[in-house]
């Protein structure tokens, strides 16, 4: 039990340090990172045909995913954004396209309107606080994406792509 609380505390401190670092990033750095990822697109996945790709409504200090989503929309992919269903529950996904209005959900995060179709993504873009060289990710600690990936992978193969800033 003591080790577990040490790990929890270590993660809490790491999250605070990374959030402070991200808050210090200048607008130019943030924009260049978003443009670089949008220029790459999802070419590295060698996706054939139209996939359902779920992005996320970026929080102020998160990676800006909008340029990538606009590119994917132009390429013919169907887009979705997550919707919070409540604490300790997996995310739900509703169809979204650039220009669609968003409602403010939990924590002020933009979510598609309730009349948008529920969809199951093939590719999930995941916001990360951090990652390491082995690909292990550090999220915000709520477990939403862990639960969501577990649910989706029980239904079908799904690809998750983490997006974060690199120091």
Residue spans of the language-model regions?
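N-terminal active-site beta-alpha-beta segment that forms phosphate/nucleotide-binding
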Residues: 2-122
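Conserved phosphate- and dinucleotide-binding cores of soluble alpha/beta proteins
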Residues: 89-167
């Amino acid at each position: 039990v003591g080790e577990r609380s040490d790990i929890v505390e270590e993660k809490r401190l790491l999250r605070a340090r990374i959030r402070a670092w991200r808050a210090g990033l200048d607008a130019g750095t943030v924009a260049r990172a978003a443009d670089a990822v949008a220029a790459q697109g999802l070419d590295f996945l060698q996706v054939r045909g139209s996939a359902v790709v779920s992005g996320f409504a970026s929080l102020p200090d998160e990676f800006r995913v909008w340029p990538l989503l606009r590119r994917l929309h132009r390429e013919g992919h169907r887009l979705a954004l997550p919707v919070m269903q409540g604490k300790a529950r997996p995310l739900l996904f509703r169809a979204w396209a650039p220009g669609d209005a968003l409602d403010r959900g939990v924590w002020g995060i933009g979510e598609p309107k309730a009349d948008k179709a529920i969809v199951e993504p093939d590719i999930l873009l995941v916001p990360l606080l951090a990652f390491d060289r082995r690909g292990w990710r550090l999220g915000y600690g709520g477990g939403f994406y862990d639960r969501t990936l577990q649910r989706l992978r029980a239904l079908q193969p799904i690809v998750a792509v983490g997006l974060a800033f690199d120091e």
